[in-house]
């Protein structure tokens, strides 16, 4: 695309091409200028750590596009992906929230099935992105959801409502996969206490900090991911579905207040924003307490109707010992031979 022909869609410096020539980034005719090729030529790291994440969204919502550009993200084709695509269906806020939690599951880039996933199909890889073995460089996949995210959000904008009500930031701290997206209305003038500065910092844990509470729970789950993640998902869906279900009623009430006095609507939505954030953090603390009790020391205590089962007598809760997944045990035996074989003593 020639940027000079797209002034309604592109904002750029008058010297965007001449500066590239001056720096040696571009030497062709103006009509052939590519901003991306000049200022950020694609290398393997950019392809696999950045472009592949875009591909994952396309693959989720436009299957034909995903299939067509799989060779591109695998480094087998140089045909770049389109800037945007039309999804196969109309997407909801919940669709985008769930997409933010993707780790390439079910695709050729899935990282839950190889040795790096550990025994419990952990869809994460520790940084750095690359490593060397015997002088050869290798890489770790970088999916949409990663553990080092500080925050993520889905921005919802609706022209059929006043700006004060129509703009909502569905905001979550830490890894998108294991956070709760809570509504933050754009007219909010008071930051939720658990989101604000002053509660903990980069070297100080705080039970009043949403960032640290979400990190605490996520770091508990990752090492035993396949065993523990569904307990987290149950609470996450419970909260997010509640916020989604309540949205229409909340905004209807806000609209009535707005028509009376916009300041009343602001106060109402500010209180609601703060309440949702605090409710999620409080529930996440309860989740963390539940997880550490249920999965203590590698066992799994039994649950009935969402509650841990108490012993009929004594102080040992009913539990099971799930151990390691069968495939992992087979891999151990394959790697170690008879090292751990139980022998019959003569």
Locations of the language-model features?
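Structured mid-domain segments that build the active-site/substrate or prosthetic-cofactor binding neighborhood
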Residues: 9-238
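Conserved small/polar residues in nucleotide/adenosyl-binding loops
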Residues: 1-6
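Charged low-complexity "KEKE/polyampholyte" interaction tracts
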Residues: 173-179, 184-346
